[in-house]
């Protein structure tokens, strides 16, 4: 706070926003999380001309150096930090390409990546409405079942997701014969349509 413009914007000095004071506010803010994200989305669109047509979805985790037993959302699970000896929570986050967050969820530390997308997708639609958005994510996050649901939704939900290497090898010969298409400076791709799927190489 004291290293930002917030004091000038609020007309207050840094004493109103000391670290512990802000921490105590978190529980109150949590009750209004969806309303706050909806408000912030509108402000970002107005102030920065931010577009929410492309959403980047990813997962991370944070661990606790505390003694078991684990409780609540603090569970043992796959540790991205190589700390399998610590309990953790999994955090799902969706942001715009500009880096503006549209939502997050804190989940149990033993939550599997491929079980998170369906619920988060519904939550974003319930808060921000249905729209023809493009979701970009790692290939380990969605299941084929969820991708099929996204394609068949009444308002189509598009996605860009990494293709498993085993499947990509099946299209290697067909992709080799495709011409390169330049999408912008120093970026060229090959496109291959297969039914409802468009592969980008």
Language model region names:
Residues 1-201:
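Anion-binding and metal-coordination hotspots
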